[in-house]
Amino acid sequence: MKGLVFVGLNKIEIQERPKPLIVEPTDGIIKLAKTTICGSDLHILKGHVPRVPFGRIMGHEGLGTVDAVGASVTRFKPGDRVIISTMTKCGRCEFCAQGMYSHCADGGWTLGNTVDGTQAEYTRVRHADDEDALVMASCMLPTGMECGVLSGRVRPGCRVAIVGAGPIGLSALMSAQLYSPSVIIMLDLDPARLEAGRRLGAMHAVLSGPHAVEEVMRITDGKGVDTAIEAVGSPPTFELCQELIGVGGTIANIGIHGGKVDLHMDKLWDRNITITTRMLDTFATGKLLELLKAGKINGKALATHSFHFNDIITAYDTFAAAAANHALKVIVDFENPGRENARL
């Protein structure tokens, strides 16, 4: 089979690899139909996730068809159409008992990390209908909801700022609207992404720059926001969240940070501020699937480009230069070469 392999810092290539086999009785082999490229894949290429070794097949999101199952698997059978959860869980360890599936002693974030991932024709590892929308439930939409909206304690009537209008920030935007905040402010350096935020429901779109804090304070009558969601993973955006947060507020970090950031305790120590960090645990995936199928969330709105798997390196180049290409989520299709390089 073909797979996209991490061969060195900022280097990937398509290689021929053996088709995966059932190893444990709980395993399933999935023939991929679609996968996507995540911001965390770019962090891996830059060396920001050092536990990922050279030689690893990339990817942790996907949708496909069950090819084979182990002897203990009873809920799925060959031929079933399924989505692949980013996180796997044993259901028995102390972390699973607490719902912290991302830290499962025998699972967690394994695909494209500690085991070969989903950017291949087959992978070793939920029932799902518009597949470009449903593939978003593998990782992106639950990350926005769990790590941003729920950790950030978004609630009716609160004021929310989302710093970063990329796929994860826009996912948080769509989830936040389910909780009826009074204000949602989107901040980004890219006017095109801010316009995407407006289309998807942001009440205000603020261009990041020297006057961004002043504008947010004007919108919030000088109070700041109750929830600041950091959806980039950089020192300037974490700094901005600290400037936007109001008394008693929560800064919810989603972004993957490849380096240190400054924490201004001299300004925050007496303001009852909460800062949260977490990994995706996928407990919201089932709820999001129902919302997608009911049309309450438009996951397909985030898919801007589609490539056939044979052109996945071009897909990476497109996603890495997202601003220049007006790219949000890039779909990689294994089944339909007729959609090659389409702009959705």
Describe these PLM feature segments.
Residues 150-156, 195-274, 313, 339-340:
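Glycine-rich cofactor phosphate-binding loops and adjacent beta1-alpha1 units
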Residues 23-24, 77, 142, 155, ...:
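Residue-level recognition of short, solvent-exposed, well-ordered loop/turn junctions
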Residues 250-252, 262-302:
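Rossmann-fold dehydrogenase core element
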Residues 191, 239-243, 282-344:
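C-terminal hydrophobic helical "lid"/dimerization subdomain
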Residues 20-35, 48-94, 129:
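Glycine-rich beta-strand-centered segment in the early N-terminal region that forms part
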